[in-house]
């Protein structure tokens, strides 16, 4: 969701903008989920740190070889507007120096990363739960020339969908992939990095890229696809209720215009103990044998949601939203012959009352989130949700459900994609000698030691928002949090209290 500034509005009204069209380009469609407004307005960057020096030429050439393969040429396309305002991809018949498959840039510092004033502040492992510098600190020295900030930067230029930027030190390397969310999301970046890794290793089993010419979801959520009613329809926020919740968000933005991003490092032992405590609480609450299942992800969402509620110091209900990948949940004509590089994310909405949010055992709150996911992640409910997506088109915002007075708390959990494991750029490592490795490295050769995903542009709308990157090689969780500047001291105290509570 974003707002057009007054200056941007006048500029758009009085400046003719032309999207460059090359008649010989191959035109590829985007999919149902690709074209919804939430995806088309986001530019994402996956920032990956390695504790070895990588050969930038091998990285560039490997990615070039991948995009030249069948189906993968989609990534070398350009985004273009159709007459009805939806988007499509125009792929050059041949990639050249003037029209490359992707944008490539690099920079190098002739010092160790620990000697760099900002590089030394990058997130690192800690014995207990800790707050670390966020993406803003990385961006200050990981400067990407002409980095896209909005959809127009693609549509009104010949910019490729994908960009690769490499920042090198004498003992470390930061690899950044930037793309428009309109083309793919979390599952897509996983498939891209996995295939890139295979190419670098010289493997012949690089998967085909499927669904480039026809949406595998084309027949789902249509009039001919009979589905059950969407469970949350009776509590859809609309009319004056929608005005109220939007006004509440705008009021919060006016009161707290600044949002900061920090990284949370939660060690394996901390998360395991927290989940065990929640399971014990849930067992006492449900009195079932065995107690209902709750995952570490459920527990982390409950824990973060409770922090937001406590930090805001009010009795507002919450609407906890969660991005949900549908690839393994929805019955669709998915083919096993290859992979799909498209958006496969739907959403769950969990209305939570203040009593549960603030005062019930944390295990009970985690179970409320788990139960909501179970109810909304069925085949029938996902089909019903895709029917809603079709009705939205490319202009309308996603619906909200629950109490109009709610505070929205958002989550995106990428743990299931195992990004630390699928990323293997080993053949591009220049040297594995101690002199070219960071002293604190815990990752295998050619594997990441840290990563996060960030969104470009105005971050004021990304508030009370958490992206769970997943587990690293120590089994620790990395979470990117978007909160207020005054929240960090409160969060450190919250972590300390939690540590004491689960250790009792």
UniProtKB/Swiss-Prot annotation:
Disruption phenotype: Leads to the loss of pyrichalasin H production, but still produces deacetylated pyrichalasin H. It is an enzyme of class 2 (transferase). Glycans are attached at residues 84, 413, 467. The active site is at 181 (proton acceptor). Residues 1-18 form the signal peptide. Pathway: Mycotoxin biosynthesis. Belongs to the plant acyltransferase family. PANTHER family: FATTY ALCOHOL:CAFFEOYL-COA ACYLTRANSFERASE (PTHR31642:SF310), TRICHOTHECENE 3-O-ACETYLTRANSFERASE (PTHR31642). Acetyltransferase; part of the gene cluster that mediates the biosynthesis of the mycotoxin pyrichalasin H, a tyrosine-derived cytochalasan that inhibits the growth of rice seedlings, but also inhibits lymphocyte capping and actin polymerization and alters cell morphology. Pyrichalasin H is indicated as the responsible agent for the genus-specific pathogenicity of M.grisea toward crabgrass. The first step in the pathway is catalyzed by the O-methyltransferase pyiA which methylates free tyrosine to generate the precursor O-methyltyrosine. This is Acetyltransferase pyiB. It comes from Pyricularia grisea (Crabgrass-specific blast fungus). The lineage of its organism: Eukaryota, Fungi, Dikarya, Ascomycota, Pezizomycotina.
């Amino acid at each position: 969701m974003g707002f057009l500034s007054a200056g941007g509005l006048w500029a758009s009204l009085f400046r003719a903008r032309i999207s460059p069209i090359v008649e010989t380009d191959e035109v590829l469609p985007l999919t149902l989920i690709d074209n919804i407004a939430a995806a088309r307005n986001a530019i994402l960057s996956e920032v990956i740190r390695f504790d070895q020096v990588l050969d930038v030429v091998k990285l560039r050439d490997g990615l070039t070889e991948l995009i030249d393969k069948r189906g993968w040429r989609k990534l070398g396309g350009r985004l273009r507007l159709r007459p009805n305002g939806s988007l499509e991809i125009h792929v050059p018949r041949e990639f050249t120096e003037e029209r490359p498959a992707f944008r490539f840039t690099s920079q190098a510092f002739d010092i160790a990363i620990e000697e760099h004033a900002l590089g030394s502040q990058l997130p690192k492992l800690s014995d207990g739960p800790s707050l670390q510098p966020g993406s803003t600190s990385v961006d200050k020295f990981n400067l990407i020339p002409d980095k896209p900030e909005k959809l127009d930067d693609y549509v009104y230029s010949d910019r490729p969908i994908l960009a690769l930027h490499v920042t090198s030190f004498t003992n470390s390397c930061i690899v950044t992939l930037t793309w428009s969310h309109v083309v793919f999301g979390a599952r897509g970046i996983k498939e891209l990095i996995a295939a890139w890794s295979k190419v670098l290793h010289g493997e012949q089993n690089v998967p085909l890229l499927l669904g480039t010419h026809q949406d595998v979801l084309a027949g789902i959520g249509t009039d001919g696809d009979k589905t059950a009613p969407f469970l949350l329809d009776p509590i859809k926020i609309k009319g004056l209720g929608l005005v109220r919740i939007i006004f509440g968000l705008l009021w919060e933005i006016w009161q707290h215009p600044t949002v900061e991003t920090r990284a949370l490092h939660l060690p394996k032992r901390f998360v395991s103990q927290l989940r065990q405590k929640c399971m014990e609480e849930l067992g006492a609450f449900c009195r079932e044998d065995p107690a209902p299942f709750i995952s570490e992800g459920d527990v982390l969402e409950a824990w973060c949601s409770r922090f937001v509620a406590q930090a805001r110091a009010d009795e507002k209900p919450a609407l906890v939203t969660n991005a949900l990948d549908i690839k393994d949940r929805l019955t669709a004509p998915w083919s096993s012959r290859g992979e799909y590089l498209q958006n496969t994310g739907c959403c769950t909405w969990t209305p939570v009352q203040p009593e549960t949010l603030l005062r019930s055992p944390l295990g009970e709150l985690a179970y409320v989130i788990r139960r909501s996911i179970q109810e909304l992640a069925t085949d029938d409910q996902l089909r019903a949700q895709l029917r809603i997506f079709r009705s939205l088109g490319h202009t309308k915002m996603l619906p909200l459900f629950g109490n109009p007075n709610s505070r929205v708390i958002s989550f995106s959990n990428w743990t299931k994609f195992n990004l630390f494991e699928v990323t293997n750029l080993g053949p591009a490592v220049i040297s594995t000698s101690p002199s070219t490795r960071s002293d604190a490295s815990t990752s295998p050769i050619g594997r990441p030691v840290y990563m996060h995903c960030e969104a470009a542009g105005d971050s004021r709308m990304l508030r009370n928002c958490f992206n769970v990157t997943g587990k690293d090689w120590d089994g620790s969780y990395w979470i990117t949090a978007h909160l207020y500047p005054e929240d960090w001291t409160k969060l450190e105290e919250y972590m300390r209290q939690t540590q004491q509570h689960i250790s009792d």
